[in-house]
Swiss-Prot record:
One of its GO terms (biological process) is synaptic vesicle lumen acidification. Subunit of the V1 complex of vacuolar(H+)-ATPase (V-ATPase), a multisubunit enzyme composed of a peripheral complex (V1) that hydrolyzes ATP and a membrane integral complex (V0) that translocates protons. V-ATPase is responsible for acidifying and maintaining the pH of intracellular compartments and in some cell types, is targeted to the plasma membrane, where it is responsible for acidifying the extracellular environment. This is V-type proton ATPase subunit G 2. V-ATPase is a heteromultimeric enzyme made up of two complexes: the ATP-hydrolytic V1 complex and the proton translocation V0 complex. The V1 complex consists of three catalytic AB heterodimers that form a heterohexamer, three peripheral stalks each consisting of EG heterodimers, one central rotor including subunits D and F, and the regulatory subunits C and H. The proton translocation complex V0 consists of the proton transport subunit a, a ring of proteolipid subunits c9c'', rotary subunit d, subunits e and f, and the accessory subunits ATP6AP1/Ac45 and ATP6AP2/PRR. Keywords: Cytoplasmic vesicle, Hydrogen ion transport, Ion transport, Membrane, Transport. It holds the Pfam family V-ATPase_G. The keyword Membrane applies. It is a peripheral membrane protein. It comes from Mus musculus (Mouse).
Length: 118
């Protein structure tokens, strides 16, 4: 009987060791999966940063030339407005005199299409 209980004890201990090994293997596998997931996440983040940086540089290059164009257009517009204002200042008195002359100087005339009927 003693040898039988001893054999059962050995089997139980072997089963316990096997269960511990399986549990350790599962833990190692979980750790490896977690580590692989973290590494993949870091790679994705690094790739995302690289692409974002590339996009920003291309956008800056495109917007830089557009910004210069915008500044040139704005400067040309200012020059035109300034030219119009100076022209208005130069011609103001002459135009006012012409308008007042046309309004105040009335010359009565008979319309050419008017027919006198007697």
């Amino acid at each position: 009987m003693a040898s039988q209980t001893q054999g059962i004890q050995q089997l139980l201990q072997a089963e316990k060791r096997a269960a511990e090994k399986v549990a350790d293997a599962r833990k190692r596998k979980a750790r490896r999966l977690k580590q692989a997931k973290e590494e993949a996440q870091m790679e994705v983040e690094q790739y995302r940063r690289e692409r974002e940086q590339e996009f920003q540089s291309k956008q800056q290059a495109a917007m830089g030339s557009q910004g210069n164009l915008s500044a040139e257009v704005e400067q040309a517009t200012r020059r035109q407005v300034q030219g119009m204002q100076s022209s208005q200042q130069r011609n103001r008195e002459r135009v006012l005199a012409q308008l007042l002359g046309m309004v105040c100087e009335v010359r009565p005339q008979v319309h050419p299409n008017y027919r006198v009927t007697v």
